[in-house]
Regions:
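Amphipathic alpha-helical interface segments
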Residues: 1-158, 184-252
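Histidine-centered, metal-coordinating catalytic motifs and their short helical/loop contexts
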Residues: 152-179
């Protein structure tokens, strides 16, 4: 596989994950503001409800496309395999610094050499930072591939539910659960934490592939914490200011 083709796939999949992350951050804002600005949001309840539902749908579909592993699909599986072949054909002695969370160290226990290195770094990290950070590991390209393959393993349950939801509700209507969206969501749950984990991994892996081949590190979405709250604060101020004259009139 040539570099341009792999980069094209990686960029396309990165864009899918990027939009999914944007949707998730917006949903996070909406959930956060619901308790604080319930009265203000109630004036546009239908809008917020429809917008939230649409973003759940869009996020599910974006992730389903990213992780689609059908033989003819261009998704994570194809990108991983094509990139692995590229690394094997173009060996490099370069190393890459990747952060591994302390809670994920156990995933690599079957590889003794790699695991022992992790344990050594873990002891330094715990001693120096009291477990407040991850382990920064210097890895060769093939070790990076091993890392990303193992890191994906805990996501398999979420991926199974994502696939079931896509096949039974979003791509077409399953004959058994036809239009029973609540039943599908209950049988194959995929909450915001699960979608966030899938999205963060998707961004990280695609970003690594692009950086490895091109040397360019793509930016990932940051939290726009105040976007929605700023608007709702204006609504709140307008509501409060419009109530003042009415209260004075009633007082007289």
């Amino acid at each position: 596989m040539d570099e341009e083709y792999i980069i094209r796939i990686a960029n396309g999949l990165f864009d899918e994950a990027y939009m999914a992350k944007r949707y998730l951050l917006t949903m996070e804002q909406m959930r956060s503001c619901t308790a604080k600005y319930r009265d203000e949001m109630s004036h546009s309840f239908a809008f917020y409800n429809d917008a939230y539902s649409a973003m759940v749908y869009a996020t599910t579909m974006a992730l389903a496309r990213y992780y689609d592993d059908d033989s003819d699909s261009i998704g994570w599986k194809k990108l991983y395999n094509d990139f692995a072949n590229y690394v094997n054909r173009m060996p490099s002695n370069d190393t890459y610094r990747i952060e591994i969370k302390l809670c994920d160290v156990y995933l690599f226990s079957e590889n003794k050499e790699f695991y022992d290195r992790l344990q050594d770094e873990k002891e330094k990290c715990v001693w120096n930072n009291f477990q407040t950070c991850g382990i920064m590991m210097e890895m060769k390209p093939k070790e990076c591939l091993y890392y990303y393959k193992k890191k994906k393993k805990p996501l398999n349950k979420h991926l199974s539910n994502l696939s079931k939801q896509r096949n039974k509700a979003f791509a077409h209507n399953d004959g058994v659960l036809c239009f029973d969206y609540e039943g599908i969501d209950s049988a194959f749950p995929l909450d915001l934490d699960a979608m966030t984990a899938l999205t963060d991994y998707a961004l990280e892996f695609s970003r690594f592939v692009i950086a490895y081949i091109t040397g360019t590190v793509k930016m990932i979405p940051g939290k726009n914490d105040n976007d929605l709250e700023n608007t709702l604060l204006l609504v709140k101020n307008a509501m409060e200011s419009s109530e003042i004259p009415q209260q004075k009139v009633r007082a007289h």
